[in-house]
From Swiss-Prot:
Annotated gene: SURF2
Pfam family, one: SURF2
One term under GO cellular component: nucleolus
Compositionally biased region (Acidic residues): 183-193
Region described as Disordered: spans on this chain: 133-256
Listed name of the protein: Surfeit locus protein 2
Residue spans of biased composition, Low complexity class: 156-165
Family (UniProt): Belongs to the SURF2 family.
Ranges annotated as biased composition (Basic and acidic residues): 135-150, 194-218
UniProt keyword annotations, A-Z: Phosphoprotein
Basic residues bias (residue ranges): 224-247
Length: 256
């Protein structure tokens, strides 16, 4: 402290929230946790800020002991505080402490703590209660779960149903000819289907083509042949017109 200039030492005395670090090169604000270079211009600019002015008015001499025994110094990190009600770490600065203590979680935990003190019951933080419930649920759910019934197709033998290989339900009944073509519906016909050879035998013989039908077919063929010849002739003409030999270059020259 004696190594600092007189104006810097006087300025730090006016602002007790600014603490000089051990290396005497930086200044730390206990209200916001900011670190500043130990120079008078930077310190003056910082103290004129709105945030610093608001915190100074709210807590001119901030005392962390007011929030004990609920908020105590952290054993893991000396620059942080620990809340026993919510089991959370807080930065060691008034702004963060005030924000935490004014929050819903802390206020709810504080009310629960006061109720437990009146009833003479030990207070257990809410997060620990949730953890215990999860562990109990996991312990209860460790047993083997009943497996769902595996789906099995119904057997084809039940109720005299047709086998799965039968494909009669996929095609119309007209495609399957029966052996008892000549028998009536009341007759004792069998349900077996005809084979390919039997199907050909069962078909009626084709009628012979008449003379008139033959004449019509010959006339039709003649017309088709004539049309084909006409089309070929027109195509040949077009091909010749497009593939004519170019005139020789000498014939294009004008006589001298």
């Amino acid at each position: 402290m004696s190594e600092l200039p007189g104006d810097v030492r006087a300025f730090l005395r006016e602002h007790p929230s600014l603490r000089l670090q051990t290396d005497a090169r930086k200044v730390r604000c206990i209200l916001t946790g900011h670190e500043l270079p130990c120079r008078l211009p930077e310190l003056q600019v910082y103290t004129r800020g709105k945030k610093y002015q608001r915190l100074v008015r709210a807590s001119p001499a901030f005392d962390y002991a007011e929030f004990e025994p609920h908020i105590v110094p952290s054993t893991k990190n000396p620059h942080q505080l620990f809340c026993k009600l919510t089991l959370r770490h807080i930065n060691k600065c008034p702004e963060h402490v005030l924000r935490h203590t004014q929050g819903r979680r802390y206020q709810r935990a504080l009310c629960k703590y006061e109720e437990c003190q009146k009833q003479g019951v030990e207070y257990v933080p809410a997060c620990l209660v949730h953890r215990r419930r999860r562990r109990e649920d996991q312990m209860d759910g460790d047993g083997p779960r009943p497996r769902e019934a595996f789906w099995e197709p119904t057997s084809s033998d039940e109720g005299g149903a047709a086998s799965d290989d039968s494909m009669t339900d996929l095609y119309p009944p007209e495609l399957f000819t029966r052996k008892d073509l000549g028998s009536t519906e009341d007759g004792d016909g069998t349900d077996d289907f005809l084979t390919d050879k039997e199907d050909e035998k069962a078909k009626p013989p084709r009628e012979k083509a008449t003379d008139e039908g033959r004449r019509e077919t010959t006339v039709y063929r003649g017309l088709v042949q004539k049309r084909g010849k006409k089309q070929l002739g027109s195509l040949k003409k077009k091909f010749k017109s497009h593939h004519r030999k170019p005139k020789s270059f000498s014939s294009c020259k004008q006589p001298g």
